[in-house]
Regions:
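One-carbon transfer enzymes
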Residues: 1-194
Length: 194
């Protein structure tokens, strides 16, 4: 396995500093290339990655790339709930299951087959800022625990259930990320009634 890891090439797609602990961990395991811009054919051909990891990456990946390379996404929701933007917050607003999911990437947004997922207990007395950090901690731990299986494609993907939810950034009301969640939810509900 060590020989395989030395030769393993990973393309790490991200747009957020919260992903750095996982990126640094991966640097010890394989050749890793961090990329923050829209993915293009040139970078894929140059690196020719064994696996492409999308983690807090804001750009849509072209269908033609998905056919040729192995893409996975790390998403901080318990799919199929809260696909898209701000899954942490929507899980409280809509009172859906909370957790983290690693899934294959397909043409949709967070709709690919599920590889692994984990429920996470979050408290309404915490803030959205602290629960966001907690979910990122859990997604990174889930990835590390399943790293060898993920890179060797030893996990059988399962189709996502048809139900679920999807949200865009513009749908989110203005909120204070540092307030206790229960207070923010009261404010959101009060604003919806007016």
């Amino acid at each position: 396995m060590k020989e395989r890891l030395k030769k393993l090439k990973i393309l790490f797609l991200t747009n957020n500093q919260i992903t750095n602990p996982l990126y640094l961990w991966l640097r010890k395991k394989a050749y890793i290339y961090k990329f923050t811009k829209p993915l293009n054919k040139t970078i894929l051909q140059k690196i020719n990655p064994d696996i492409v990891i999308s983690y807090n990456y804001r750009y849509i990946i072209k269908k033609e790339f998905l056919k040729k390379y192995y893409f996975i996404n790390l998403h901080i929701s318990y799919l199929p709930f809260n696909r898209g933007a701000h899954p942490n917050i929507w899980s409280f607003i809509e009172n859906t299951k909370k957790g983290v999911t690693i899934h294959l990437i397909d043409e949709g947004i967070d709709t690919g087959d599920i590889l692994v997922q984990k429920r996470v207990v979050l408290d309404k007395n915490d803030s959205f800022k602290s629960t966001y950090k907690k979910l990122h901690f859990h997604i990174q731990m889930l990835f590390k625990q399943n790293f060898k299986k993920l890179i060797n494609k030893k996990i059988k993907p399962k189709k996502q259930p048809k139900n679920g939810t999807f949200h865009l950034s513009k749908e989110l009301p203005s909120i204070d990320y540092n307030k206790p969640i229960y207070k923010v939810l009261k404010e959101i509900n009060a604003n919806r009634k007016t």
